[in-house]
């Protein structure tokens, strides 16, 4: 269903700055809206727009989509931190366009936030959103959202390692054994491991408890959604409506 918004309010909601800055963008002819006959420059700040999810518009020559809430997928490269205040490595948020980082929030931090964290040297699938409920559902252990990791170890592994991880290993901060939801060797030094919780450095610590050092770690899947191989490290894209429905269904099942 379409929602009617003033153009300045639309731009503000999508993270293009204060309403004063948004009004300036309009007045300078830097905003183009789809009028049904293609994108047309709009200069009147009091213009009302009927907005729908995914509606295209252009700001300063860059094409955007309107989304009430932002749900994006980032292919996290190595050497980046999942933090707004990184300690030693560039932030993953620096890979996102400014509007995604500036989307206004009624409470908490503005802009999209990572759904869980990946270590600086871990690559792969990272979801981000400004929907707090979505973030909670996807990251809370009680929802058991499976996450698949592909890893390589320094030394060769044997079938006994798989058995240990499936039966459960004890980490140094928790007497309760931690189990893999699924685990399979994919080579003498490689493995696919599925977890449904996200403890600190969990994959590396589980493998260490089983006697192996992880030298490469990549998250390839969250729920039923597999990382798109056409999305290069450092690139991002919007989640489709179908992908979002599939992810949220997983947390409700």
List PLM regions with ranges.
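S4-like RNA-binding module at protein N-termini
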Residues: 1-87
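Loop/turn elements at beta-strand to alpha-helix junctions within RNA-recognition modules
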Residues: 15-16, 120, 196-200
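RNA substrate-recognition surfaces in RNA-acting enzymes
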Residues: 36-52, 167-253
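Flexible glycine-/small-residue-rich
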Residues: 61, 74-76, 128-131, 153-155, ...
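Short, charged/polar surface micro-motifs in flexible loops or helix N-caps
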Residues: 77-80, 89, 98-101, 121, ...
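A short, contiguous, amphipathic alpha-helix enriched in charged residues
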Residues: 84-103, 162-169
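Glycine/acidic-rich beta-strand-loop module
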Residues: 102-140
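Non-catalytic RNA-recognition surface used by pseudouridine synthases
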Residues: 133-190, 206
